[in-house]
Amino acid sequence: MTLPIDEIRDEFERRLHAANRLVVTAETGAGKSTRVPVWLAELFPGLILVVEPRRVACDALADFLSAERGEATGGFFGSRVRFSDRSSERTRVLFCTPGVALRMLVEAPAPGAIVVDEFHERSWQMDLVVAAAASVPRLREVPLILTSATIDAEAAARPLAATTLHATGRMFPVDVSYEAETIEPNAEQIGPRAANAIGKALRTHEGDVLVFLPGLKEIRAVEASLGRCPEEVLVVHGSQPPEAMRRVFQRSTRRRIYLATNVAETSITLPGVRIVIDSGLAKTQLHRAGRAVLATVPISQASMQQRAGRAGRVAAGVCVRLWSERFGVEPYQRPEIERVELDDLLLQAAELGLVGAAFD
């Protein structure tokens, strides 16, 4: 199957041979997460380290690419997250979370290449991985690739002296509409409001439904409002056991409603989804009055774009936003390094031997 990202394959190779730092951008569903690691495995010896923001994406991508290759996960493609290692000596492409990547950069031999996928998420651990790749002497010659659908590519490339490369085109169009009655995203009455939007979408459009909600509490509220509906309702949340998450990616003969947090926002494709219902909210860690809090906040324009793109990965789709188009949102979420206490970052930076590493 040809994907939009394939159009830059030759240029990707040329630019990496000219300079080993590259920022790759393309629309959601273009194939960044699945194609780029494979290209790198063909170009460079050693382990290709692919850093994903969440464990769900690590396991899902390793499973998907292994299935395409006709083998079990842990062969050519593997995943490694906290408390779970599905890799072997034969693994060439390893999908891992930022925390695992940092430990490997300290303890393991230098990888053949490093990919930081969905870099717009800008967790402090992702930033530290990039800082290490750019600053630690034994890693400076390792090719470093940042990928995203929504990042400001020039701003990301500048501190790294990296080049940028963009793939045009997307998989399928997505029609976006707004709920005019609600001015701004809010969690009040989210259960009945989302259930009403789901019911309307199921009656007027084809395909499965993906609903973005800020947390498990809101997921349970929508689940209760749906009641005993004929569709199969599945929860997509980081607390779900691996067996439950693997079921999410298996095809079904029944129509499905996926109730998800932002773990479903990037890197993964849920089969059959052509409808997205977006609450416009997410849980974000903030530092307030001397302590860390997990707050429910409106998402950025970048996240809005990512979520809408989930509806256009398998066919033309629709996205319903549960707030008014008049509500203004920030273009990007502030990097986590600007929102939280930096004790853990400083400890890991010291362990890596980083001094004075900084990102705009």
Model-predicted segments: where are they?
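P-loop NTPase motor module signature
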Residues: 1-360
